[in-house]
Design a protein with these regions (language model features):
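Short, Lys/Arg-enriched N-terminal segments with co-localized hydrophobic residues
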Residues: 1-9
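ABC family nucleotide-binding domain
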Residues: 11-12, 17-178
Length: 178
């Protein structure tokens, strides 16, 4: 019983994860021997100086990039064994993102930006979810404002509301506090 529930509570794990890139002067190791376990409901922060590989690690964990070695399991899916199309499907079903640059569409209002991922996934209650999460981040009075009409902090909160509105199993945030 314990091992079974332990395994199914695991939302993300890595074993001996490695990322390297080829350069003119040889192979550069970006990440080496990364072992990580994250259970459902846990929150973790990956910290380190600029250039230490945090964003690279996030890209690997979310299945946005291929590892050079090791294993990555995201909600029991072996990302290290999947091709890009299969990883994309796993992301669609399991992952939400808050990007460093917010990635808001300038021609859409705050409400529409938050609704978009839910609508793309044919969620019936996209508007209700978007309004709920925009209220949770204190932007209920700014629903019909475009990104250019919002401060940087407000744009960031729209991006956070969008990520939560997807109701994903795991949320990745790359420098969510700016």
């Amino acid at each position: 019983g314990f091992l079974f529930s332990y395994y199914w509570d695991m939302i993300l794990s890595t074993k001996n994860l490695r990322k390297e890139v080829s350069t003119d002067s040889g192979t550069l190791v970006i990440l080496e021997d990364i072992n990580l376990e994250v259970r459902k409901g846990e929150t973790i922060a990956i910290t380190g100086p600029s250039g230490s590989g945090k964003s690279t690690l996030l890209g690997l964990l979310a299945g946005l990039d291929d590892a050079s070695g090791g294993e990555i399991f995201l909600n029991q899916h072996p990302l290290h064994l999947l091709n890009e199309e299969q990883r994309s499907e796993v992301r669609k079903e399991n992952v939400g993102f808050v990007f460093q640059s917010f990635e808001l569409l300038p021609g859409l209002t705050a409400l529409e930006n938050v609704m978009l991922p839910s609508e793309l996934n044919s969620r019936k209650n996209a508007q209700e979810l978007a309004q709920y999460y925009l209220k949770r981040v204190g932007l209920e009075e700014r629903l019909n404002h475009y990104p250019r009409q919002l401060s940087g902090g407000e744009q960031q909160r729209v991006a956070i509301a969008r990520a939560f509105a997807c109701e994903s199993k795991i949320l990745f945030a790359d420098e969510p506090t700016g």
